[in-house]
């Protein structure tokens, strides 16, 4: 996510770079700026509250340094990872490149995924490594995130510890998932909760509701794949707002008036 709200993730596949241990990236130990980075990290760790923006900026600086100096062996590892992960990773990387090129632009204004993917593959075939550079930067990040999470899980299991995680019922409006499969969402609606004892005005969670008929027409492939991705990392999954599979408060995207909202 671009903010600190964990349920506003830009992907149901990729891992958040915020959790990357950049000290384990190849090239970190010999970096001239290592002491400066570690001094800044110490200051950030001493804060009473997490400064998400500053943490992201520092980690991005380290990642860029290490990626720009990655050797052939490291890049071969990244390419092998990208080959194994297929379209999930490619879609994520292309999305991130578009987001960097068009900051603040809603995904509904991006060119379609199939078009962008085809153009990228065609350009890559002609220009080779140069065309890959931006895309591989994000594959590099995910490669080491997956590697670190895998090692963490192995260590936990050796000590008889299980890993449990949340699966939010919704996905971010400006996400890879909405970009790749907009037909699975009602983009003119937003999910939330009706007025109650805790919130007199109700709640607007900001993410689009699902088109369950479109989901069913594809045998719920998107959902089955989402669970499969999470099962790679987790031993147990808590579905946040499981009632959302049966009914959810739907608010017109163009209106904050809860009187126009209803359960669907």
Regions found by a protein language model. Name each.
Residues 241:
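Walker B catalytic acidic pair
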Residues 154, 162-233, 247-264:
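Substrate-binding/active-site clefts of carbohydrate-active enzymes
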Residues 1-182, 215-216:
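Acidic/aromatic-lined carbohydrate-recognition and catalytic surfaces
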Residues 244:
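Divalent metal-binding pocket/active-site signature
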């Amino acid at each position: 996510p671009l903010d600190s709200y964990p349920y506003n993730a830009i992907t149901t596949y990729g891992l958040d770079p915020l959790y990357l241990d950049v000290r384990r990236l190849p090239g970190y130990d010999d970096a001239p700026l290592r002491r400066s980075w570690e001094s800044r990290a110490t200051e950030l760790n001493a804060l009473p509250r997490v400064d998400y923006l500053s943490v992201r900026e520092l980690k991005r600086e380290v990642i860029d340094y290490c990626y720009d100096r990655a050797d052939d062996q490291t890049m071969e590892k990244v390419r092998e990872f990208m080959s194994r992960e297929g379209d999930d990773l490619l879609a994520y990387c292309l999305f991130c490149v578009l987001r960097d090129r068009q900051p603040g632009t809603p995904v509904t204004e991006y060119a379609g995924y199939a078009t962008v993917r085809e153009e990228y593959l065609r350009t890559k075939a002609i220009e080779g490594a140069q065309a890959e550079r931006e895309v591989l930067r994000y594959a590099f990040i995910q490669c080491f995130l997956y590697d670190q999470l895998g090692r963490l899980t192995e260590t936990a299991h050796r000590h008889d510890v299980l890993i449990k995680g949340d699966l939010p019922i919704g996905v971010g409006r400006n996400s890879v998932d909405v970009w790749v499969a907009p037909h699975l969402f009602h983009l003119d609606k937003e999910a939330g909760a009706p007025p109650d004892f805790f919130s007199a005005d109700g709640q607007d969670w900001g993410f689009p509701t699902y088109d369950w008929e479109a989901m069913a027409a594809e045998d719920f492939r998107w959902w089955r794949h989402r669970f499969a991705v999470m099962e790679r990392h987790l031993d147990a999954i808590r579905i946040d707002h499981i009632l959302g599979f049966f009914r959810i408060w739907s608010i017109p995207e163009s209106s904050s008036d809860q009187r126009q909202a209803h359960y669907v």
